[in-house]
């Protein structure tokens, strides 16, 4: 205690008069609390922070102690009043010849049960009105509890229904998952086969494209077509063809007139040979014109 007093004095000198009052209150409170249990105040470091905390704790403890003292005194006063009232009631009953000793045992038992029920219902007396009020309060509480129970039961049923549906859904999903796992191996094999076929088809497609381009080029070279031939060259070729048709038309008309002559093999042969030479010359001229047009386009 001497160390504690020294520490308190040091803190008191450092903080001034207001802290000194707090330190005195803290010292008195600590001493009373530890002496109540037969122990001494332990040594610890007293600082401004610890003094403030202990002061707040002491203030709260004293306030609660005062409140508890007031409540205890009130209970003692009520108990003494109840005892006095019980003594008066006992005197009245004894004067009327209705003391507890003179009453039948069943009456005493009933009175005891009535008192126990009153205590259980937490009512001040055993008047009928008090019992009715208490029973009404219990009925209201019972109704509230039943409503809460019905609501909880409804929510429980809904949750149970959701749980059943979730379990069914989970079972279905597990079944689907197992089926998919069983189908993985054959599907992987089929996918590998499709992949191989796709690669082969891609190679074939490339080959067919190359062959198509090759055949297309060969065909174009055979007919003498080049990408440089424009619409103008084609129109010129068509005009040359019309000119050749005009040139060959008299020959064809002459040949047709020979069809009406009597058959003369020698003359017919000579005429045919002559017309063949003319037709060959016209065809050669057409080829030269076409070739000249192609060469001009290439240049």
Curated annotation (Swiss-Prot):
Top-level taxonomy: Eukaryota, Viridiplantae, Streptophyta, Embryophyta, Tracheophyta
Residues the record lists as N-acetylserine modifications: 2
GO biological process, one term: cell division
Source organism: Arabidopsis thaliana
Keyword Cell cycle: yes
Coiled-coil regions listed in the entry: 76-96, 164-184
Keyword Cell division appears in the UniProt entry: yes
Designated name of the protein: AUGMIN subunit 1
Family: Belongs to the HAUS1 family.
Null mutant phenotype: Lethal when homozygous.
Function as written in the Swiss-Prot or TrEMBL entry: Involved in microtubules reorganization during spindle and phragmoplast development.
PANTHER family: HAUS AUGMIN-LIKE COMPLEX SUBUNIT 1
Quaternary organization: Part of the augmin complex composed of 8 subunits. The complex acts on microtubules and interacts with gamma-tubulin in spindles and the phragmoplast. Interacts with AUG3.
Location within or outside the cell: Cytoplasm, Cytoskeleton, Spindle; Cytoplasm, Cytoskeleton, Phragmoplast
Annotated signal peptide: none
GO CC, alphabetical: HAUS complex; microtubule; phragmoplast; spindle
